[in-house]
UniProtKB/Swiss-Prot annotation:
Keywords: Ribonucleoprotein, Ribosomal protein, RNA-binding, rRNA-binding. One of its GO terms (cellular component) is ribosome. One of its GO terms (molecular function) is rRNA binding. One of its GO terms (biological process) is translation. Binds to the 23S rRNA. This is Large ribosomal subunit protein bL9. Belongs to the bacterial ribosomal protein bL9 family. Pfam families: Ribosomal_L9_C, Ribosomal_L9_N. The gene is rplI. It comes from the Bacteria.
Length: 149
């Protein structure tokens, strides 16, 4: 019997492949556990159409992420904080604060705190380069200027 795999199956194939299996294995295990469907022309064409839509959606999302990275690289985020006598901040600048200030100063950029990579919290004034990982292999940086209030 010919089946279309819906997910990767060890020693058989990867999702989307059409495989020839024995009737019992196909009906009693693969189809029963929704790991595969009977490979008819209709099922194969439907799966290919869904895969194509998914690939187009992923390409669009990646393009949007690349556009966001290009925009991020052109900005410098300014954060005003109270500073002690030796130039250190009262408190530290964290990922949450960076995302809040980014939304305030640049409303079109919507980053989540999990997208920002901080090696350590920022505790003094100066200019810092912050790394942003948006998924799909898209990585960028932007600058933060921490100034005394």
């Amino acid at each position: 019997m010919k089946i279309l795999l819906l997910e990767d199956v060890k020693n058989l194939g990867k999702a989307g492949e059409v495989c020839e299996v024995k009737d019992g294995y196909g009906n009693n295990f693969l189809i029963a556990n929704q790991k595969a469907k009977l490979a008819t022309n209709e099922v194969i064409n439907k799966y290919k159409a869904e895969a194509k839509k998914k690939a187009e959606k992923e390409a669009l999302e990646k393009a949007q992420k690349l556009q966001m990275v290009e925009t991020l690289q052109t900005i410098t985020l300014t954060i005003h904080k109270k500073v002690g006598a030796n130039g250190s901040l009262f408190g530290a600048i964290t990922k949450e604060e960076i995302t809040e200030r980014l939304k305030e100063q640049h409303a079109s950029l919507d980053l989540d705190k999990k997208d920002i990579e901080l090696k350590h919290p920022i505790k003094s004034t100066g200019i810092y380069e912050i790394e942003v990982k948006l998924g799909s292999g898209v990585v960028g940086t932007f600058k933060i200027d921490v100034v005394a209030e």
